């Protein structure tokens, strides 16, 4: 991250995009790196830098805050997941990161989970879990919607249909008038 001579070499190279892990980095280090690599498309991969990572440590809001601060830059945001507790926690964490603005997910993959591994590999998921994660993420992505704050066409139509309706608190006698007491 703070290898400034490397930043200069990358900037002068023909490399078009750079993937940078920013977990464990200060905001100052991140902003300096972005300034140094201003000629490149940058992919910032955020992940809490303890293996394995518990969900309460994630601080995924950092993705959203960095995205807001760097909105005019040529930057893509991603999330590197190190969840140790299986598919469900992985799905929650990855889906939450997408809601915060991540568009790339990194997840350790282990095609042979039955073989004993080092402690750092406890966050890896098997083939079936990986496929399930991809399926779930593809369902979640459209839920975020577009960056609009007004009603869409369907909401406007529905609102129009219900805003003209009256409902009584009980049965009304013939020819009775609506009042605030009976609607």
Name these PLM-found stretches:
Residues 1-183:
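Catalytic cores and adjacent flexible loops of soluble metabolic enzymes
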């Amino acid at each position: 991250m703070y290898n400034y001579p490397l930043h200069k070499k990358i900037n002068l190279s023909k490399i078009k995009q750079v993937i940078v892990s920013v977990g464990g980095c200060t905001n100052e280090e991140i902003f300096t790196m972005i300034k140094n690599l201003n000629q490149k498309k940058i992919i910032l991969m955020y992940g809490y830098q303890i293996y394995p990572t518990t969900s309460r440590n994630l601080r995924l809001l950092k993705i959203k805050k960095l995205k807001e601060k760097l909105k005019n830059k040529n930057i893509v945001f991603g999330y590197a997941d190190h969840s140790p507790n299986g598919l469900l926690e992985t799905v929650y964490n990855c889906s939450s990161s997408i809601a915060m603005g991540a568009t790339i997910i990194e997840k350790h993959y282990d095609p042979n989970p039955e073989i004993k591994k080092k402690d750092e590999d406890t966050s890896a998921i098997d083939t079936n879990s990986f496929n399930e994660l991809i399926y779930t993420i593809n369902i979640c992505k459209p839920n975020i919607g577009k960056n609009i704050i007004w009603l869409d066409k369907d909401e406007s139509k529905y609102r129009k249909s219900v805003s003209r309706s009256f409902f009584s608190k009980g049965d009304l006698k013939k020819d009775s008038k609506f009042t605030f007491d009976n609607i």
